[in-house]
Swiss-Prot record:
<dbReference type="GO" id="GO:0005524">
    <property type="term" value="F:ATP binding"/>
</dbReference>
<dbReference type="InterPro" id="IPR027417">
    <property type="entry name" value="P-loop_NTPase"/>
</dbReference>
<keyword id="KW-0472">Membrane</keyword>
<dbReference type="Pfam" id="PF02874">
    <property type="entry name" value="ATP-synt_ab_N"/>
</dbReference>
<comment type="function">
    <text>Produces ATP from ADP in the presence of a proton gradient across the membrane. The catalytic sites are hosted primarily by the beta subunits.</text>
</comment>
<keyword id="KW-0139">CF(1)</keyword>
<keyword id="KW-1278">Translocase</keyword>
<dbReference type="InterPro" id="IPR005722">
    <property type="entry name" value="ATP_synth_F1_bsu"/>
</dbReference>
<comment type="subunit">
    <text>F-type ATPases have 2 components, CF(1) - the catalytic core - and CF(0) - the membrane proton channel. CF(1) has five subunits: alpha(3), beta(3), gamma(1), delta(1), epsilon(1). CF(0) has four main subunits: a(1), b(1), b'(1) and c(9-12).</text>
</comment>
<dbReference type="GO" id="GO:0016887">
    <property type="term" value="F:ATP hydrolysis activity"/>
</dbReference>
<keyword id="KW-0813">Transport</keyword>
<dbReference type="GO" id="GO:0005739">
    <property type="term" value="C:mitochondrion"/>
</dbReference>
<keyword id="KW-0934">Plastid</keyword>
<dbReference type="InterPro" id="IPR050053">
    <property type="entry name" value="ATPase_alpha/beta_chains"/>
</dbReference>
<keyword id="KW-0547">Nucleotide-binding</keyword>
<dbReference type="GO" id="GO:0042776">
    <property type="term" value="P:proton motive force-driven mitochondrial ATP synthesis"/>
</dbReference>
<dbReference type="InterPro" id="IPR004100">
    <property type="entry name" value="ATPase_F1/V1/A1_a/bsu_N"/>
</dbReference>
Amino acid sequence: MRINPTTSGSAVSTVEEKKLGRIAQIIGPVLDVVFPPGKMPNIYNALVVKGRDTASQQINVTCEVQQLLGNNRVRAVAMSATDGLTRGMEVIDTGAPLSVPVGGATLGRIFNVLGEPVDNLGPVDTRTTSPIHRSAPAFIQLDTKLSIFETGIKVVDLLAPYRRGRKIGLFGGAGVGKTVLIMELINNIAKAHGGVSVFGGVGERTREGNDLYMEMKESGVINEKNIAESKVALVYGQMNEPPGARMRVGLTALTMAEYFRDVNEQDVLLFIDNIFRFVQAGSEVSALLGRMPSAVGYQPTLSTEMGSLQERITSTKEGSITSIQAVYVPADDLTDPAPATTFAHLDATTVLSRGLAAKGIYPAVDPLDSTSTMLQPWIVGEEHYETAQRVKQTLQRYKELQDIIAILGLDELSEEDRLTVARARKIERFLSQPFFVAEVFTGSPGKYVGLAETIRGFQLILSGELDGLPEQAFYLVGNIDEVTAKAMNLEKESNLKK
C-alpha cells in the first residue's frame, strides 16, 4: 500500500521553482499548459492553478494531465469549474497523481473528488493519503473462496444471490428504484453485518445525495454524536460538476475502500451510483480531448477505462471489496455499449423491471432476467437451488400463458395451468417486500428476511399448502408467517363488512 505523508510548505516551494507552467489555452474544462523544456509532468500528474480572477476572488483549480502534445505542451482536464482562469496564469506540477485521505478519519464524512470534506464538519486528518491511480492486485494476492453475501432481500437472496468480494450490477431505466435498493442494502449491511461501506455518488442528483446523507444519519449508519463510530464514507461527484470530477470520483471512492481492505484487513462494501455516469463522463472528456468517437458516440477507450476501475475491485488474502453498482440503461436498451461493457465484469445482475414497478411490486426486481454465477447446487446447496429453479419455472410458465389469458380468459386454461397461474401470482407478490428506507413513504415497517426463512416461504407456496390464502395476503410482507397473519386479518375485515 503506497502511503503519501503530507508534504511540508518548503517542499512545495521547491516543486514550484522546478516545475512551473503557464496556461496557453482554455476550452471549457480542458486546459493546455506550456512547461519549460525538460520539466514536463507525467500522465495523470495533478496540476494546481492558483491565483485571483478579475473580481479578485481566490482561484484554486486542480487538473489532471491526460495528454502530452509535444512542443513542451500538455493537455489537462479540470476537476472543478474553470471560471475566472485566464491565459498566462501559473500552473504548478505537484509531481504526483491526485492523492486522497484514507482510513478511519474518512468514516461519517462527505468528500469531493479531491478528497476535500464538503460537509462543513471541519478538516479531516490527512496524514495518511493514497494516490487514486494504482494497479490492480497481482493474481497471487487474490482470494478465490466462494461465499454468499446475505442481503435480507428475498428476491435477491433466493434467485440471484450476491457473492462476497465480487461485483453486482443493478440494471434499470429511470425511476424504477435503483437508488432505493442501494440505500436498503447499505442499511441492511450496516445493521446485520456491521461492515464498513464506501458510497461513490458518480454523476447523480445532488438532491439524492443529500437525501441519502440525511437517511444515514436517521438510521444511525452515520453517528452524528461520535463520527468515528460511523459505518460509511461518502464521496460525491454530482451531475452539476465538470466531467473530469465525475470521471475520477469513482476512483476516489475505490481508493478509500482499498485502504480498509489492504491495511485494516476488513470486508468492505463499495456502492457506485451510477456506473453509467462514469462512462458518460469519460465520453465527454474523450470528445474534449479530440478522440474519434466509437459506437453510439462512446469513447474508443471504453473497455480500457471500465477495466482499470473494475479490476481493482476484488478479494485479496487481506480482505474483500464487494461492489454493488447501479447501472442506468439508456432507453431500457441492454445492448447499449455502456451497460454491455459493464455486464462483462459482473458476477450477479439484479435487473429492475418497469412492468413490475407499474404493478406496484417493489423491489421491482425481474426474477427471470436477474442472474448470478452463485446459483449452482454445489455452492448454495440442493435445497436452495431446487427452490429457486421451481420458482423460476412457475413464473416462466405464467409468462407463457399470459397471452392466452389476455385473449381467451382464465376459464379456458386446464386445471393444472390455472393452479400454476394462481401460485405464480402469489410468488410474484411474495417477492415484494417492505423496505426500511421506504417506511416514510409506505407507512409499512421494513423487514429483513434471512435466507432460510425465504427458502421455507417459497417451498410452502410451491407445495400448495397456501393455495387457500388470498393473493393480497402475500403482498408487501416479510416472512411466510406474516402472510398467514395478514390472511386472517383480511378474513376478519371481510366478515365485518358483511
